[in-house]
Amino acid sequence: MRGATSAPGPPRPRGFPYLLLPGNFGPMSETLPNIGEMLLATVPMAKTLNLEVVEATAERAVLRLPDQSDFHNHVGGPHAGAMFTLGESASGAIVIGAFGDQMGRAVPLAVKAEIGYKKLAMGVVTATATLGRTKEEVVAELDAGQRPEFPVHIAITREDGAVTGEMTIIWTLRPQG
């Protein structure tokens, strides 16, 4: 990530959501990074696990955890903590996609997470995240001066399509200032 090219001023904190501020992407002619690039640039754990961003939009985020022996559990499949991180990262990607335009006035924070492990996971696993409320509902609450909360639902699947885990993460948009 490059720093701002504008006139010197007080140092800016780095990381999410500051990555989204104007001036953090170099000259105006350069394009903003996509949602997956933002996630990987601001969440070091996602890079540590070598998570792959398959799709990341305001409607859906799909991330993949490759089969890596360094992150296996005692039965040779992905560790529960790695699968949790995969799901949480997918939820973060959809939050960036849906609410990235609100980051100048609110900070997204995960406030609660629940996971259920349904079947044995082996090999590559994929997390698919979807919003549990519409963006319009959440932004309307923010506009009204509230601190909205909204669920993100995540399904974790094996390559054969079997659901190995389900998560719900409650996020909030904490108003700044």
What are these regions (language model features)?
Residues 94-133:
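Hydrophobic beta-strand-centered segment that forms part of the acyl-chain substrate-binding groove
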Residues 1-12:
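Compositionally biased, low-complexity flexible segments
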Residues 24-44:
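Extreme N-terminal tail/first-helix region
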Residues 47-53, 111-117, 137-139:
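Short structured motifs
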Residues 16-18, 25:
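Aromatic (phenylalanine/tyrosine) cluster motif
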Residues 121-122, 132-177:
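HotDog/MaoC-like acyl-thioester-processing domains
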Residues 66, 70-93, 103-105:
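Hot-dog-fold acyl-thioester-processing enzymes
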Residues 48-78:
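Catalytic strand-loop segment that frames the active site of acyl-thioester-processing enzymes
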